[in-house]
């Protein structure tokens, strides 16, 4: 499978909720600018996957032009079917044992100063894919020591052993997205559990790692829901936060319930800072990897040391 194969970009597919002017931005497949060509060639030549493509991220052009990308490990088939997500659901293939090496070589070749690693849920694996994350981190440190590493992880079913495997590799930032408010979990992401995700985040923070999470709006949440979610995240050790607008990936996905106005995202950013979060990215097109390198360097003084 060619991970760079063209696919329809995210758009509003709910006719009852018109696409507002502030969401009408160009999100077409990238053209062949020099920076885009470099990233595309790297990913394609090493047979890698990026979440930029697999999840139809609206910031693909912007990030690839900056020579940044989020690598998606462990294949492109997920064992969970979340209603908001564009990653394919099904039975995954066995892990590719050479993938960590290829990712590390790609990071080295691109000269990245900050890399984000994520993965599909691999509930078919005993450790949920934690060892695969750890090996990739270790390989990157071997080939490109100056690159800082952020991981965006599944919940690993809150397994202590899986989390410890990840910790041993010493990534700089560990992100686990809460995604939505507690009341919507049964509908939006029934194979996940709100309190379990909070437990995972607290576990990460308690082990000294800079802890990050994110929420998407427009799924039917109330302001009270969002405020409580932010309070919960902070209480469980999260200090880096992203807040973005949900975009319906396809006709079978959960429909957009509302488009949150830009000034409301500003309000939530101000609220989050008042709660105590250290860095907050909040806006209609913000995603969990949005300007991750810049936010990392803002917070580098509180990262764990080797």
Swiss-Prot record:
GO terms for molecular function: 4 iron, 4 sulfur cluster binding; lipoate synthase activity; metal ion binding. Keywords: 4Fe-4S, Cytoplasm, Iron, Iron-sulfur, Metal-binding, S-adenosyl-L-methionine, Transferase. Residues 64-278 form the Radical SAM core domain. Binds 2 [4Fe-4S] clusters per subunit. One cluster is coordinated with 3 cysteines and an exchangeable S-adenosyl-L-methionine. Its EC number is 2.8.1.8. [4Fe-4S] cluster 2 binds at residues 78, 82, 85. It catalyses: [[Fe-S] cluster scaffold protein carrying a second [4Fe-4S](2+) cluster] + N(6)-octanoyl-L-lysyl-[protein] + 2 oxidized [2Fe-2S]-[ferredoxin] + 2 S-adenosyl-L-methionine + 4 H(+) = [[Fe-S] cluster scaffold protein] + N(6)-[(R)-dihydrolipoyl]-L-lysyl-[protein] + 4 Fe(3+) + 2 hydrogen sulfide + 2 5'-deoxyadenosine + 2 L-methionine + 2 reduced [2Fe-2S]-[ferredoxin]. [4Fe-4S] cluster 1 binds at residues 52, 57, 63, 289. Belongs to the radical SAM superfamily. Lipoyl synthase family. This is Lipoyl synthase. It comes from Leptospira biflexa serovar Patoc (strain Patoc 1 / ATCC 23582 / Paris).
């Amino acid at each position: 499978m060619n991970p760079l194969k063209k696919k329809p970009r995210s758009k509003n597919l709910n006719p009852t909720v018109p696409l507002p002017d502030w969401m009408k931005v160009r999100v077409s497949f990238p053209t062949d600018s020099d920076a885009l060509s470099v990233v595309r060639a790297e990913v394609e030549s090493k047979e890698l996957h990026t979440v930029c493509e697999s999840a139809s991220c609206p910031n693909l052009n912007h990030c690839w032009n900056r020579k940044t990308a989020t690598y998606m490990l462990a294949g492109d088939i997920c064992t969970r079917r979340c209603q908001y997500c564009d990653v394919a659901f099904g039975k995954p293939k066995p892990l590719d044992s050479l993938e960590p090496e290829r990712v590390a070589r790609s990071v080295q070749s691109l000269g990245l100063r900050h890399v984000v690693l994520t993965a599909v849920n691999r509930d078919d694996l005993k450790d949920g894919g934690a060892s695969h994350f750890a090996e990739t981190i270790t390989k990157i440190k071997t080939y490109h020591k100056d690159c800082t590493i952020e991981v965006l992880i599944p919940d690993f079913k809150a397994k202590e052993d899986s989390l410890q495997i990840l910790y041993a590799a010493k990534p700089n930032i560990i992100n686990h997205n809460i995604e939505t408010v507690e009341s919507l979990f049964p509908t939006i992401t029934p194979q996940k559990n709100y309190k379990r995700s909070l437990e995972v985040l607290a576990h990460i923070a308690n082990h000294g790692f800079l802890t990050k999470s994110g929420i998407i709006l427009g799924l039917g949440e109330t302001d009270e829901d969002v405020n409580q979610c932010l309070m919960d995240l902070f209480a469980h050790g999260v200090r880096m936060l992203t807040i973005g607008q949900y975009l319906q990936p396809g006709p079978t996905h959960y429909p957009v319930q509302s488009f949150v106005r830009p000034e409301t995202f500003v309000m939530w950013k101000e609220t989050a800072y008042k709660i105590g979060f250290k860095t907050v990215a909040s806006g209609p097109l913000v995603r969990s990897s949005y300007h991750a390198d810049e936010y990392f360097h803002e917070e580098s003084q509180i990262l764990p040391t080797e």
